[in-house]
């Protein structure tokens, strides 16, 4: 991708009035926050404004937490896959070829993350690394 764009997927009145021609440009990554409830409309708008239905897309639910889940598909099937998986907010939707790198770059696997370790002398916890690092 040559650029990245962040956009909100939910406006106060419930509309998603975005600059779709700008968002649907090739060779860019689009990240949409607060858009899970309108995901079918969002995917349809990308396709209507020129992105191929086969464009990689994914949703990250509860990113970087122990409850993180990732659903990867294409624009044509993402909304249904997300419904089938029961994905809920908070989540980010990512659209663009960068999503195709997910299998290679899936560095975050919640079950592999270290658990918090209490430090009795400090009254805090170490989440990554070891006490004394």
What residue spans do the PLM features occupy?
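A contiguous loop/helix-start segment that scaffolds small-molecule binding in enzyme catalytic cores
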Residues: 3, 8-133
């Amino acid at each position: 991708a040559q650029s990245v764009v962040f956009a909100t997927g939910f406006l106060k009145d419930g509309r998603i009035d975005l600059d779709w021609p700008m968002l649907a440009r090739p060779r860019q990554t689009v990240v949409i926050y607060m858009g899970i409830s309108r995901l079918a409309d969002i995917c349809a708008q990308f396709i209507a404004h020129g992105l191929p239905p086969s464009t990689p897309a994914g949703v990250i639910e509860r990113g970087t937490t122990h409850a993180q889940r990732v659903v990867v598909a294409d624009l044509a099937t993402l909304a249904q896959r997300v419904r089938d998986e029961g994905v809920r907010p908070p989540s980010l939707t990512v659209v663009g070829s960068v999503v195709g790198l997910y299998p290679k770059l899936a560095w975050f696997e919640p079950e592999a993350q270290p658990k918090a370790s209490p430090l009795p002398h400090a009254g805090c916890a170490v989440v990554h690394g070891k006490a004394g690092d």
